[in-house]
Amino acid sequence: MYLGEDFKKFLEPQTNRRDFILNWLSARGVKTAVMPIDGHEHICVVFPKESYSPLFKIKTVIAHYDIFPGSPGANDNTSSVFCLMNWAARLYNSGIRHNVRLIFTDGEEIASVRKDSEPAQKSFSAENPVSAQGAFGLANVFKRLNIVDDDVYVFDCVGRGTVPVLSKSFVPLKAASKFRNSFFSIESRIARILRSSCDGKFVSLPVPYSDNAGFLAHGIAAVAVTMLPVDEANEYMFNLVRFPYLEDFVLNRKVPQDVEKSFLEKMIPASWKKFHTRQDNFDSLTEESFVMMEKILQNLAVLKIPC
């Protein structure tokens, strides 16, 4: 269903990814608007006004559409984009009041491109600051317009495996109580959605960064969801218990003095090792991941959160 010729065409090096999304959605009657912010071009789906009810909160759903230079970007992040494009087409003429604001963001991978030739990992560091993300500028606009009470759901790299992974995020103890409560509420909501979509088989794990970091940095509650194969998720959880410092390596690329970096790199899930390489290709994807995502998005569409 998802992994057809359109998907392959989207992966072609010469494809203008922004135009592809606009044209694909337009061909299915879906209206869009391009939002230029800080040199990036984000794409917003313009749902009919009848899609919204003032009685419930807006659910902002995001996936970055840019890819790392030289990588096909099949999982990172064409997988999420294609899932959301299909979802947008289904929602657009559904007639239901879903309260979804859907945005395809640009510039997430720019934070991963270093001046030297070595591809950076998907994690934060001095070389890869959260402020370099395209979504950081978008979150800044949200903050300026006082759009701070939305739920923000980010989908990143959902094309391999059947285990939904909720990115483990940390809220500073000094954070405002309103923000802390908002974050824990959205975390609880997405956990319920993931649990009901996959017979309870979901996990919360440390994950390399995604667009939710830019929103969190602005005090806007946001969660990120990715996917892993069962064997990779189990092995990763086991290694996190055995070697607690693995978490800091995944999130911040920090290596303890008495540990070899190569030792830690071996414990990174195989799916993540494909990021930013030629191995992140069409053949690496699994059809069942997209079936799982369809269930998750359907449950998210019907979720109603009273204002």
Residue ranges and their predicted role:
Residues 57-69:
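Glycine/charged-rich beta-loop-alpha catalytic/anionic-binding loops adjacent to active sites
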Residues 1-50:
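A non-catalytic alpha/beta surface segment that caps or lines the substrate-entry region
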Residues 50-58:
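Proline/glycine-enriched tight loop/beta-turn segments at coil->beta junctions
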Residues 1-16, 22, 66, 266-283:
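N-terminal capping segment at the start of a domain
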Residues 16, 20, 24, 86, ...:
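Extracytoplasmic/secreted proteins, especially bacterial periplasmic and envelope-associated proteins
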Residues 232-307:
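His/Asp/Glu-rich mid-to-C-terminal helical/loop segments that flank catalytic regions of hydrolases
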